[in-house]
Amino acid sequence: MTVTTPFVNGTSYCTVTAYSVQSYKAAIDFYTKFLSLENRSSPDENSTLLSNDSISLKILLRPDEKINKNVEAHLKELNSITKTQDWRSHATQSLVFNTSDILAVKDTLNAMNAPLQGYPTELFPMQLYTLDPLGNVVGVTSTKNAVSTKPTPPPAPEASAESGLSSKVHSYTDLAYRMKTTDTYPSLPKPLNRPQKAIAVMTSGGDAPGMNSNVRAIVRSAIFKGCRAFVVMEGYEGLVRGGPEYIKEFHWEDVRGWSAEGGTNIGTARCMEFKKREGRLLGAQHLIEAGVDALIVCGGDGSLTGADLFRSEWPSLIEELLKTNRISNEQYERMKHLNICGTVGSIDNDMSTTDATIGAYSALDRICKAIDYVEATANSHSRAFVVEVMGRNCGWLALLAGIATSADYIFIPEKPATSSEWQDQMCDIVSKHRSRGKRTTIVVVAEGAIAADLTPISPSDVHKVLVDRLGLDTRITTLGHVQRGGTAVAYDRILATLQGLEAVNAVLESTPDTPSPLIAVNENKIVRKPLMESVKLTKAVAEAIQAKDFKRAMSLRDTEFIEHLNNFMAINSADHNEPKLPKDKRLKIAIVNVGAPAGGINSAVYSMATYCMSQGHRPYAIYNGWSGLARHESVRSLNWKDMLGWQSRGGSEIGTNRVTPEEADLGMIAYYFQKYEFDGLIIVGGFEAFESLHQLERARESYPAFRIPMVLIPATLSNNVPGTEYSLGSDTALNALMEYCDVVKQSASSTRGRAFVVDCQGGNSGYLATYASLAVGAQVSYVPEEGISLEQLSEDIEYLAQSFEKAEGRGRFGKLILKSTNASKALSATKLAEVITAEADGRFDAKPAYPGHVQQGGLPSPIDRTRATRMAIKAVGFIKDNQAAIAEARAAEENFNADDKTISDTAAVVGVKGSHVVYNSIRQLYDYETEVSMRMPKVIHWQATRLIADHLVGRKRVD
């Protein structure tokens, strides 16, 4: 690292203090490596002087056990918030240095395995921060002045033969890094001076939406990394048959447009022959003949088990092939090892160790839409419908469909009852719902549903009970293979793409001793798991069910599955049974919608209200936002019958607008809070809701009525609320935009040489445009975080022209350019299309397309519905748990301290970080982690996705 100016403030000497011998030695080692300092002090047990030509740093040892414990606790706290909060807001001391090469700093910190935060982004930082062993925040900046705001991307390294094959370093294995690429389409890195690896991909077992996205990502990332890409047609059947007809080399353009197609374009088939050794022997021979030395399998547990067996037998298979003269000595030496990797393509979501499988959310989407449609006809005739869904031994589809459609009853294999119990339970719930005026009855049956004695429960059994015992006009709907059909939803396309990239990384990094990896998603991060261990855990569920050990079967499911089941039972009972809480623990809780409509808002209101009823709380709705309350006292207690159907409706049933409390009338709002004696408040909405919570929390000193627990559930398609990686409505909006883009792309494909510039909403957030770009394979995307430079625009026009030339004579010809509305104030989508058309000089033309408020979506997606339910119930729990913390403060008016952390923490944002639900104080978020003028969080968590999207379409980025 080159330190050109010692400290940002110009000083050249600094002293830091260690309070234990261990931290003292660690600090000497840290600063020696980090700042390339030399130890220039004479031997001394209590101090060390480190320096170079620009800096002198003295480290003192002052042993103090008490202070050292505090330092260790502070350091532990800072490490725990590395990915979620800005260290600078928690720092007691900090040092900041200047550097001429911030990339070298980043590489040094990565080599040291030191924690790291970068601003404005970790990809292209102007400032980098780490933690020293003494609890200090140590920063480095490349800017020349303190108010510089334009990030300077680090220089890209030249590709060389020494580039490491590790996803932990920047190389061909990391598509989320900016590197020098060629000027021609597709823009790829210069080839390395090493033998080309040949990577094949195959899909096996049952097809699943998203498999094509997985294949596309594997083929293109393999090519991007200098490898040859092959596909094995018709699954294991293609391996056994072999030859160029079944093992084909694919090139960049061969997978163009595949993301928008359902099923698997390379085919899949069940192959009994591969289960025999002779079949696997043929498969090995055919792979060797094609020169393939790495295989990625996308399929379920059976397909992945076969792949791992194939790899374990590989040494003996090739020995036998050599002995029988079916391969040459040269082939034997070159193909001694086969690297295998698995990605899970299954609509059942039954694979242990991963939170989601490719295709599961698409199948759930089909089921929910089908039930939404069925409910309309059920309501017309006051009928009951028994809906059978897939899932084998996993009840995930049935459970989440039950939550998303507010079904009356569900049958899942993990929680069976005796034959008489399930009949009594179902009839009790259905009759209670009917007696309260519900005209429809929906019962969801998983195909693996069983009674406690392992007797299968069929839709016919359920139909018979509903007819015979309740006299309901009942119909059976078996969705069957409709659940597998159609194009993948946005989540599955993105998941399949990111897992495809990591699968290529995994096979490139594998050694003969590395266990076969499975690419999984845990806490929203793509990770590798041992393949066979995952398969064994998956099969253990079925074994536990067969052994009637249902407690173990449930324990093998992830904690979120159990939470969903408890949530379903709570919201389904509503106020039909005796409340769980005693009268003195029951609360009055209000809910209000603030900001623009977003998918899932109604689901949150419905779930909050029904959960409150089941506990004994009284739910209130504030209609038409803060202005409705201040002007018209629009407050109403919610009752169950009035909310029927809300779980699956779009928009906002209780009304919403962008008015904040200060704009409406804080005094009147406080008056009505006091009049109705609210014990808690839930706000659902976007950045205006975030502002509202901030204003109410700040007003607590003046208005005692606001001294109650208050919580915000983020809901906005922009996904720009600080404190969460996910806002309700963003998935619905992403799917609406994706479907619009698919249709527009089809139109562009029909007209040769046509590109569409699609205007995306999102305010100053590029989330929607970024993820839609990845999901639909857009050639270019422009977002507010980067803007539109003339140099990049010129490069993009030339790149588009070349891509049209390459695609000549092929199908799926259309091109898409996504532009966030605020990416440029000067260039609207219309103006941008005109500029592109003029500069293209007749080689192609561009037209604008405005999806507008269509992006808010119609029916909310199942992801938004189920997450709304989860977050609403968490919000009610937060209010209940924080009553005691603020109760005393409410009573002691004179001694009220709004700055007390215990008090300020009772106003929070409930958010999703990874797969965890977290609570962040509104004061902490607003003061330290928000760019208020930009209506954005300071840390952009989706930044790396942009480079992945660009690399997968061969776009060249201009630094």
Swiss-Prot record:
<dbReference type="InterPro" id="IPR000023">
    <property type="entry name" value="Phosphofructokinase_dom"/>
</dbReference>
<dbReference type="GO" id="GO:0005741">
    <property type="term" value="C:mitochondrial outer membrane"/>
</dbReference>
<keyword id="KW-0547">Nucleotide-binding</keyword>
<dbReference type="GO" id="GO:0005524">
    <property type="term" value="F:ATP binding"/>
</dbReference>
<protein>
    <recommendedName>
        <fullName>ATP-dependent 6-phosphofructokinase subunit beta</fullName>
        <ecNumber>2.7.1.11</ecNumber>
    </recommendedName>
</protein>
<keyword id="KW-0479">Metal-binding</keyword>
<feature type="binding site">
    <location>
        <begin position="300"/>
        <end position="303"/>
    </location>
    <ligand>
        <name>ATP</name>
    </ligand>
</feature>
<feature type="region of interest" description="Interdomain linker">
    <location>
        <begin position="574"/>
        <end position="587"/>
    </location>
</feature>
<keyword id="KW-0418">Kinase</keyword>
<keyword id="KW-1000">Mitochondrion outer membrane</keyword>
<dbReference type="InterPro" id="IPR022953">
    <property type="entry name" value="ATP_PFK"/>
</dbReference>
<dbReference type="InterPro" id="IPR029068">
    <property type="entry name" value="Glyas_Bleomycin-R_OHBP_Dase"/>
</dbReference>
<feature type="modified residue" description="Phosphoserine">
    <location>
        <position position="163"/>
    </location>
</feature>
<feature type="compositionally biased region" description="Low complexity">
    <location>
        <begin position="158"/>
        <end position="167"/>
    </location>
</feature>
<dbReference type="InterPro" id="IPR035966">
    <property type="entry name" value="PKF_sf"/>
</dbReference>
<dbReference type="GO" id="GO:0003729">
    <property type="term" value="F:mRNA binding"/>
</dbReference>
<feature type="binding site">
    <location>
        <position position="935"/>
    </location>
    <ligand>
        <name>beta-D-fructose 2,6-bisphosphate 2</name>
    </ligand>
</feature>
<feature type="binding site">
    <location>
        <begin position="853"/>
        <end position="856"/>
    </location>
    <ligand>
        <name>beta-D-fructose 2,6-bisphosphate 2</name>
    </ligand>
</feature>
<feature type="binding site">
    <location>
        <position position="475"/>
    </location>
    <ligand>
        <name>beta-D-fructose 6-phosphate 1</name>
    </ligand>
</feature>
<keyword id="KW-0021">Allosteric enzyme</keyword>
<keyword id="KW-0472">Membrane</keyword>
<feature type="modified residue" description="Phosphoserine">
    <location>
        <position position="803"/>
    </location>
</feature>
<keyword id="KW-0496">Mitochondrion</keyword>
<feature type="binding site">
    <location>
        <begin position="761"/>
        <end position="763"/>
    </location>
    <ligand>
        <name>beta-D-fructose 2,6-bisphosphate 2</name>
    </ligand>
</feature>
<dbReference type="GO" id="GO:0070095">
    <property type="term" value="F:fructose-6-phosphate binding"/>
</dbReference>
<feature type="modified residue" description="Phosphothreonine">
    <location>
        <position position="152"/>
    </location>
</feature>
<feature type="binding site">
    <location>
        <begin position="390"/>
        <end position="392"/>
    </location>
    <ligand>
        <name>beta-D-fructose 6-phosphate 2</name>
    </ligand>
</feature>
<feature type="binding site">
    <location>
        <begin position="270"/>
        <end position="271"/>
    </location>
    <ligand>
        <name>ATP</name>
    </ligand>
</feature>
<dbReference type="GO" id="GO:1902600">
    <property type="term" value="P:proton transmembrane transport"/>
</dbReference>
<comment type="pathway">
    <text>Carbohydrate degradation; glycolysis; D-glyceraldehyde 3-phosphate and glycerone phosphate from D-glucose: step 3/4.</text>
</comment>
<dbReference type="GO" id="GO:0070072">
    <property type="term" value="P:vacuolar proton-transporting V-type ATPase complex assembly"/>
</dbReference>
<dbReference type="GO" id="GO:0061621">
    <property type="term" value="P:canonical glycolysis"/>
</dbReference>
<feature type="binding site">
    <location>
        <begin position="716"/>
        <end position="720"/>
    </location>
    <ligand>
        <name>beta-D-fructose 2,6-bisphosphate 2</name>
    </ligand>
</feature>
<keyword id="KW-0324">Glycolysis</keyword>
<keyword id="KW-0597">Phosphoprotein</keyword>
<dbReference type="InterPro" id="IPR015912">
    <property type="entry name" value="Phosphofructokinase_CS"/>
</dbReference>
<dbReference type="GO" id="GO:0003872">
    <property type="term" value="F:6-phosphofructokinase activity"/>
</dbReference>
<feature type="binding site">
    <location>
        <position position="447"/>
    </location>
    <ligand>
        <name>beta-D-fructose 6-phosphate 2</name>
    </ligand>
</feature>
<feature type="modified residue" description="Phosphoserine">
    <location>
        <position position="171"/>
    </location>
</feature>
<keyword id="KW-0963">Cytoplasm</keyword>
<feature type="binding site">
    <location>
        <begin position="481"/>
        <end position="484"/>
    </location>
    <ligand>
        <name>beta-D-fructose 6-phosphate 2</name>
    </ligand>
</feature>
<feature type="region of interest" description="Disordered">
    <location>
        <begin position="144"/>
        <end position="167"/>
    </location>
</feature>
